[in-house]
């Protein structure tokens, strides 16, 4: 009987028995390997190619079986560059899926997709490892408690609050601030949260990965003097990696997070930047595996691949995984199959708008497009819910009036509409906020605003108590008291 690696426990490597095959064909990152009759590896088994290239350099490439082709051939995807591989090279079947180190030994370290440390800080204790392919927790193991996760970011906490143990997506095109927002969330939550975090860098810029590492060392989330006291494990498979690595690095990060949840019974934060690159890597590999492309050229297995990752990110009775994922939106088109498939799995969506970014309003979160299943009076309370709805109504009315203002000017509006526009512009500016991680760029110190303070501030604007203050007083401030103080300063400067 053959064990299915997706449901089996941690398998034991069988390198001693050495089930050997050899390379028959290489197409970019995809290899065809021939094995002796009756010795075919299972799907998802890890294969290792060891040898020397034509100039005598040592080669060590790990691949993952994706398809059984018949005639004793399997098709596998390489997790690192296939440069130097030649036909006829020997391939060893490890007899198990890729396994990565898990547990306390991973904290404060940077890993690649194979679970190998890449931070030059020496080897990692690999006594506890776990396979990256597992089935999702059973339905009866899931936890259904509803509670809010406070982030300290006004626009998020008020209009699209995050669920503790839920899945959150940050949607935006290129350059509207997804990574900065994720770094601010790491700064605010990972520090206040006290639990452990796992960061999966999937197909993003290496520079950003480096910046994040340096920032975490500065803020103490990674403790350089005593690595074991660090609060985060980092797993990177960046833009320069082959598609096999980018396709699996999310699973490596998730496997580490699952261990903290299931074995250590902790509440874990899982950051993934960027989930779109996971889909993109699958799409790159799909055609080479001989699959017919589906909508917009994506892989036909898009929703299955996404589901197998997302369904494992969940809260059980042992502990919770709260996942925050950045989602790149190609050409700002939210109907593209990649972001559209991601939407289905999320509890809250934070949509970033290029229009707001162009106005200089950061975080550029669209108050009308962003949604959350948590924004219900029974969960957040009547006061919060009413305030959020009024803010949305005012913003919506302002959006409707913009065409009239552009053609006829403000003077043609009724008194009531003019007041709505003035308040909406104040709300728009008050939704901006200085970030801790952006202090170097903006020069203004970051602000954390509690939920009660946020609700109070917007209630004051909506009630009309602050109608006399200039709108620039609300731009890039923390709570409402800072806005009134800024207004007094502006008044003093103008005299």
Curated annotation (Swiss-Prot):
<keyword id="KW-0150">Chloroplast</keyword>
<dbReference type="InterPro" id="IPR050053">
    <property type="entry name" value="ATPase_alpha/beta_chains"/>
</dbReference>
<keyword id="KW-0547">Nucleotide-binding</keyword>
<dbReference type="InterPro" id="IPR004100">
    <property type="entry name" value="ATPase_F1/V1/A1_a/bsu_N"/>
</dbReference>
<keyword id="KW-0375">Hydrogen ion transport</keyword>
<comment type="function">
    <text>Produces ATP from ADP in the presence of a proton gradient across the membrane. The catalytic sites are hosted primarily by the beta subunits.</text>
</comment>
<dbReference type="InterPro" id="IPR027417">
    <property type="entry name" value="P-loop_NTPase"/>
</dbReference>
<dbReference type="InterPro" id="IPR024034">
    <property type="entry name" value="ATPase_F1/V1_b/a_C"/>
</dbReference>
<keyword id="KW-0067">ATP-binding</keyword>
<keyword id="KW-0793">Thylakoid</keyword>
<keyword id="KW-1278">Translocase</keyword>
<dbReference type="GO" id="GO:0009535">
    <property type="term" value="C:chloroplast thylakoid membrane"/>
</dbReference>
<dbReference type="GO" id="GO:0005739">
    <property type="term" value="C:mitochondrion"/>
</dbReference>
<dbReference type="GO" id="GO:0005524">
    <property type="term" value="F:ATP binding"/>
</dbReference>
<dbReference type="Pfam" id="PF00006">
    <property type="entry name" value="ATP-synt_ab"/>
</dbReference>
<dbReference type="GO" id="GO:0016887">
    <property type="term" value="F:ATP hydrolysis activity"/>
</dbReference>
<dbReference type="InterPro" id="IPR036121">
    <property type="entry name" value="ATPase_F1/V1/A1_a/bsu_N_sf"/>
</dbReference>
<dbReference type="Pfam" id="PF02874">
    <property type="entry name" value="ATP-synt_ab_N"/>
</dbReference>
<protein>
    <recommendedName>
        <fullName>ATP synthase subunit beta, chloroplastic</fullName>
        <ecNumber>7.1.2.2</ecNumber>
    </recommendedName>
</protein>
<dbReference type="InterPro" id="IPR000194">
    <property type="entry name" value="ATPase_F1/V1/A1_a/bsu_nucl-bd"/>
</dbReference>
<dbReference type="GO" id="GO:0045259">
    <property type="term" value="C:proton-transporting ATP synthase complex"/>
</dbReference>
<keyword id="KW-0813">Transport</keyword>
<dbReference type="InterPro" id="IPR055190">
    <property type="entry name" value="ATP-synt_VA_C"/>
</dbReference>
<feature type="binding site">
    <location>
        <begin position="172"/>
        <end position="179"/>
    </location>
    <ligand>
        <name>ATP</name>
    </ligand>
</feature>
<comment type="subunit">
    <text>F-type ATPases have 2 components, CF(1) - the catalytic core - and CF(0) - the membrane proton channel. CF(1) has five subunits: alpha(3), beta(3), gamma(1), delta(1), epsilon(1). CF(0) has four main subunits: a(1), b(1), b'(1) and c(9-12).</text>
</comment>
<dbReference type="InterPro" id="IPR003593">
    <property type="entry name" value="AAA+_ATPase"/>
</dbReference>
<keyword id="KW-0139">CF(1)</keyword>
<keyword id="KW-0406">Ion transport</keyword>
<keyword id="KW-0066">ATP synthesis</keyword>
<dbReference type="GO" id="GO:0046933">
    <property type="term" value="F:proton-transporting ATP synthase activity, rotational mechanism"/>
</dbReference>
<keyword id="KW-0472">Membrane</keyword>
<comment type="similarity">
    <text>Belongs to the ATPase alpha/beta chains family.</text>
</comment>
<keyword id="KW-0934">Plastid</keyword>
<dbReference type="InterPro" id="IPR020003">
    <property type="entry name" value="ATPase_a/bsu_AS"/>
</dbReference>
<dbReference type="InterPro" id="IPR005722">
    <property type="entry name" value="ATP_synth_F1_bsu"/>
</dbReference>
<dbReference type="Pfam" id="PF22919">
    <property type="entry name" value="ATP-synt_VA_C"/>
</dbReference>
<dbReference type="GO" id="GO:0042776">
    <property type="term" value="P:proton motive force-driven mitochondrial ATP synthesis"/>
</dbReference>
């Amino acid at each position: 009987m053959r064990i299915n690696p997706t449901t089996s426990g941690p398998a034991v490597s069988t390198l001693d028995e050495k089930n050997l095959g050899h390379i028959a064909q290489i197409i970019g990152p995809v290899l065809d390997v021939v094995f002796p009759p009756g010795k075919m590896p299972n799907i998802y088994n890890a294969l290792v190619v060891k040898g020397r290239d034509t100039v005598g350099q040592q080669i060590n490439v790990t691949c993952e079986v994706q398809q059984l082709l018949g005639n004793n051939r399997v098709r596998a995807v390489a997790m690192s560059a296939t440069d130097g591989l030649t036909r006829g090279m020997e391939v060893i079947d490890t007899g198990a899926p890729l396994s990565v180190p898990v547990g306390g030994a991973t904290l404060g370290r940077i890993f690649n997709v194979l679970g190998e440390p890449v931070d030059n800080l020496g080897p990692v204790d690999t006594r506890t490892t776990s396979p990256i392919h597992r089935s999702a927790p059973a339905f009866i193991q899931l936890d259904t408690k509803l509670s809010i996760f406070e982030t300290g970011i006004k626009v998020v906490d008020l209009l699209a609050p995050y669920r503790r143990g839920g899945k959150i997506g940050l949607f935006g095109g290129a350059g509207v601030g997804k990574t900065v927002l994720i770094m601010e969330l790491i700064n605010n939550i990972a520090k206040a949260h006290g639990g452990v975090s796992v960061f999966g860098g999937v197909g993003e810029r290496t520079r950003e990965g480096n910046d994040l590492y340096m920032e975490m060392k500065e803020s103490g989330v990674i403790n350089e003097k005593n690595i074991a006291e660090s609060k985060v494990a980092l797993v990177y498979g960046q833009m320069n990696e082959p598609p096999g690595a980018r396709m699996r690095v999310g699973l490596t990060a998730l496997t580490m997070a699952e261990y903290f949840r299931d074995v250590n019974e902790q509440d874990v934060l899982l950051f993934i930047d960027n989930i779109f690159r996971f889909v993109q890597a699958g799409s790159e590999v799909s055609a080479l595996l001989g699959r017919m492309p589906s909508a917009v050229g994506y892989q036909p297995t898009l929703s299955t691949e996404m589901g197998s990752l997302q369904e494992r990110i969940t809260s059980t009775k042992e502990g919770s995984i709260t996942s925050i994922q950045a989602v790149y939106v190609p050409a700002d088109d939210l109907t593209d199959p990649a972001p559209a498939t991601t939407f289905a799995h999320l509890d809250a969506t934070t949509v970033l708008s290029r229009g707001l970014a162009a106005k200089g309003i950061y975080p550029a979160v669209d108050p009308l497009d962003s949604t959350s299943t948590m924004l219900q009076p029974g969960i957040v309370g009547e006061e919060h819910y009413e305030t959020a709805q009024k803010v949305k109504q005012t913003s919506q009315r302002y959006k409707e009036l913009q065409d009239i203002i552009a053609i006829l000017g403000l003077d043609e509006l009724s008194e009531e509409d003019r007041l709505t526009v003035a308040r909406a512009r104040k709300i728009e500016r008050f939704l901006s906020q200085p970030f801790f991680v952006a202090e170097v760029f903006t020069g203004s110190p970051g602000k954390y605003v509690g939920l009660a303070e946020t609700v109070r501030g917007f209630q004051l604007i909506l009630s009309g108590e602050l109608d006399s203050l200039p709108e620039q007083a609300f731009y890039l401030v923390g709570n409402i008291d800072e806005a009134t103080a800024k207004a007094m300063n502006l008044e003093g400067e103008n005299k």
